[in-house]
């Protein structure tokens, strides 16, 4: 599992994300309420931004390459590849 720190508007939370599990699924299992809509990487409701670490979001993404290079991730499809620090609730920053 990878140690993942979620920086949310209501505080900072740390959870362990099992290998192969998305950030959104792991957060929900731990009882954290993150925003989401489609759960399929096809919208930006669950958008977060990676502060440190890396994720795999190759399952298909609403984001373009430039947005991904800036660190934006869709938590519903993003699977940690290392320990992570991620800011959640970032949808309004995209537009």
Swiss-Prot record:
Gene Ontology CC: chloroplast
Alphabetized UniProt keyword annotations: 2Fe-2S, Chloroplast, Electron transport, Iron, Iron-sulfur, Metal-binding, Plastid, Transport
Cofactor: [2Fe-2S] cluster
Cofactor note: Binds 1 [2Fe-2S] cluster.
Residues that bind [2Fe-2S] cluster: 38, 43, 46, 76
InterPro entries: 2Fe-2S_ferredoxin-like_sf, 2Fe-2S_ferredoxin-type, 2Fe2S_fd_BS, Beta-grasp_dom_sf, Fd_pln
Keyword Electron transport in annotation: yes
Top-level taxon of origin: Eukaryota
Location within or outside the cell: Plastid, Chloroplast
Single GO term (MF): metal ion binding
Signal peptide coordinates: none
Pfam families linked: Fer2
Gene Ontology BP terms: electron transport chain
Record family assignment: Belongs to the 2Fe2S plant-type ferredoxin family.
Described purpose of this protein according to its UniProt entry: Ferredoxins are iron-sulfur proteins that transfer electrons in a wide variety of metabolic reactions.
Protein name in UniProt: Ferredoxin-1
Species this chain originates from: Equisetum telmateia (Great horsetail)
């Amino acid at each position: 599992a990878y140690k993942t720190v979620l920086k949310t508007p209501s505080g900072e939370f740390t959870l362990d994300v099992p290998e192969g599990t998305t950030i959104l699924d792991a957060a929900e299992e731990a009882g954290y309420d993150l925003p989401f809509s489609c759960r399929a990487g096809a919208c930006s409701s669950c958008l977060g931004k990676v502060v440190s670490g890396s994720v795999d979001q190759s399952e298909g993404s609403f984001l373009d390459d430039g947005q991904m290079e800036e660190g934006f991730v869709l938590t519903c499809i993003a699977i940690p590849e290392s320990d992570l620090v991620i800011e959640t609730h970032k949808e309004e920053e995209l537009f």
